Structures are given as C-alpha cells and as structure tokens.
Amino acid sequence: MAAQNGNTSFTPNFNPPQDHASSLSFNFSYGDYDLPMDEDEDMTKTRTFFAAKIVIGIALAGIMLVCGIGNFVFIAALTRYKKLRNLTNLLIANLAISDFLVAIICCPFEMDYYVVRQLSWEHGHVLCASVNYLRTVSLYVSTNALLAIAIDRYLAIVHPLKPRMNYQTASFLIALVWMVSILIAIPSAYFATETVLFIVKSQEKIFCGQIWPVDQQLYYKSYFLFIFGVEFVGPVVTMTLCYARISRELWFKAVPGFQTEQIRKRLRCRRKTVLVLMCILTAYVLCWAPFYGFTIVRDFFPTVFVKEKHYLTAFYVVECIAMSNSMINTVCFVTVKNNTMKYFKKMMLLHWRPSQRGSKSSADLDLRTNGVPTTEEVDCIRLK
C-alpha cells in the first residue's frame, strides 16, 4: 500500500513486525526509510522529533487560537452588520468558515496525535477519515475562495464598467466553491484508514492517514498531479496574473481628469486592499510550495529519501507550516483588511448596554439586515 497523510501518499515498501504482519490485509512499507520498527529504536524519543513536536505544538495551538477566535469574530460581525457585506467579504466568509471548522474540530485531534500521543491515533477509523476529509476540504475551499476573490477584484478594477455579480450569481459562485472542494476531496476520506506504524515497548503506534493499494499507484499519482494542477499551480498562476494586471491599473496608469478627494481616497483603499491580497498570495505560495514540493519528491523520486531516518518528522513539520497559512489569512482579513474588530466591539457594546439602544441613529439600527451586498465605500470595506 501507499500510505497517505492528509492528501499525500507514502509510496515506499514497509514490512511490519512479523507478529503483526498476519493481521494486516495489505502490503505496507516504510522499510526504505529506515523507520524504527522495534523497541530498541523509537523515533519519538530522538532530539529531532522533540524539536519537531515543539514546532508542531506551537503551530497547532496558534491555529486553534487565531483561527478559532479570529474567524468567529469575523463571521459574527458579518452576520450582524450590513456594512461588512459585499461579494469579497462573502467569499472571505467561506474561507473563514472552513478555517474555523478546522481550528475547532481538526486541530485538537491533531494536537493529540502529534504532540500528546506522539504519532499514535486512538480515535477510530471514522474520526480518522472525517478529520482527514474536513482538513482537505478546508484547504480546497481556501484556495478556491482566494481564486474567486482575485478574479472579482480583477473584474471590479480592470473592467469597472462591466456589471458586478448579482445575488444569484454570487450564491452560485459560493456554492461552486464548496461543491468542487467537497467532490475532489472525497478520496481523502475514502482511502483514509488506520494501521500499525511501529511498536514501542509493546505499545502500538497507530498511523492515521490515506492508504492507497499498490495496484492503484498510477491512479494515486494521476490524482495527485490533478490536485497539484487544479488546486495549486492553476490558482497561483491565475491569481498572479490578476494581481499583476490590477497593480498596473492602480499604480502605473494615469487617472484622467481632476481627482477629487473622494477619488483619491477610493484609490488608496483599493491599493491597500490589493496589497493585502498580494501578501496573502505570497504567504500561500511560501507555505504550500514546500508541502507540494516535498510530496512530489517523495512520491515520484522516492530514492531521494532512502535511509533518511528523520524523513517522517520533516514531513510533519512541512505539513504544519502549510496548515499555518490559515493563521496568516485570518490575521490579514480580520485585523488588516476589514475593520472587523471595530464592528465586533460595537456589537458587544450594543449587547452589554441595552439601555443605549434607543439612542442609536437610524444608520446604526439599519446595520442589522439581510440585504444583498452593496458597493458603497465605507472605511475601505466597500470595493466597487
């Protein structure tokens, strides 16, 4: 079998201890990587794994705190206030929902797997498949949402005379983001399972991840290349082209006619937003490129890692760096781009000071609404 953690596969041959080989219905091997397979050699006791465990623990704790709290604040403020609702923020909300679910559901299980139990899954096959699936769906939702945001910004800035998306089109786009992500992530749940990784002092270390049969190696590699193209290379190239064209429009093209203060303010707002989005794209590439690169080398050039004792530890660190990208997205979208905290504080004040509600202006009272996204400029949030 080729074992896969997250959405990647381990292709080398692994020979489990003879006392346990008969209980396994598949051929599965880490032997080429010289992983510890007996009580005399435990990779979880090495200094390398100890350092990796600290890095992984800090990353997962950061994801749970930043993405859990930050995305909750954003979703709550977006639900409460009409002024925060436009197409861009609705797309960001989908990214926030997926990251929030990972932070509160997947990360606690992964903290237990990587840090507490040190590479041993104790929660059963169903949860193993569910956690793998949810994490993979979240990645694809994030990627597709970022791509949709880039295209939306491109159309709004480079082709301002073209009509913007209406409510029905926006709803269809959001549904498409989720449906594509849900469908192409199905193999991460279907092939997810548990198996004995190695034995330490008569205790089994249970691996949780995707395991593809040996006779389906070609299918796995084809699937991975499809994902690599559709969910990484394609979106990155498209977003880069969109932001390059937008940058030319905002920074290098002269604006005809007299520029009023309102026009200059709108231009500053658009530049600020595009800079944030470009930083998010850069962070996405820096976080996920090592993960995909590591996976390509491991699955297509396995001899590179032959006899590399700390291979698996290195992969887990690379995987955690990739997952940490969600923290960068949350910080940028919640604290930089949107003034979300200002609206969240206002919401808290309205909740804890009910006596002041009667003195609120009609503009404030109009904030609680289910209206369709508008295109006004408000604190650089509206982006026409």
From Swiss-Prot:
| MF term (GO), any | neuropeptide Y receptor activity
**Extracellular topology ranges:** 1-54, 111-136, 193-223, 295-313
SUPFAM superfamilies, A to Z: Family A G protein-coupled receptor-like (SSF81321)
Which Gene Ontology cellular component terms are annotated?
Answer: plasma membrane
Q: Which residues lie on this side of the membrane: Cytoplasmic?
A: 76-89, 158-171, 245-273, 335-384
Q: Which residue ranges does UniProt annotate as crossing the membrane? A: 55-75, 90-110, 137-157, 172-192, 224-244, 274-294, 314-334
Cystine crosslinks: 128-208
Identify the domain of life: Eukaryota
Localization, per the record, is:
Cell membrane
Q: Which PROSITE patterns match?
A: G_PROTEIN_RECEP_F1_1, G_PROTEIN_RECEP_F1_2
Where would I find glycosylation on this chain?
A: 7, 27
- What residue stretch is flagged as signal peptide? none
Q: Topology versus the membrane, per the UniProt entry?
A: Multi-pass membrane protein
Q: List, alphabetically, the Pfam families matched.
A: 7tm_1
Relate the assembly described in the record: Homodimer.
What illness does the record link it to? Hypogonadotropic hypogonadism 3 with or without anosmia: A disorder characterized by absent or incomplete sexual maturation by the age of 18 years, in conjunction with low levels of circulating gonadotropins and testosterone and no other abnormalities of the hypothalamic-pituitary axis. In some cases, it is associated with non-reproductive phenotypes, such as anosmia, cleft palate, and sensorineural hearing loss. Anosmia or hyposmia is related to the absence or hypoplasia of the olfactory bulbs and tracts.
Recorded family membership:
Belongs to the G-protein coupled receptor 1 family.
What is the protein name given in its UniProt record? Prokineticin receptor 2
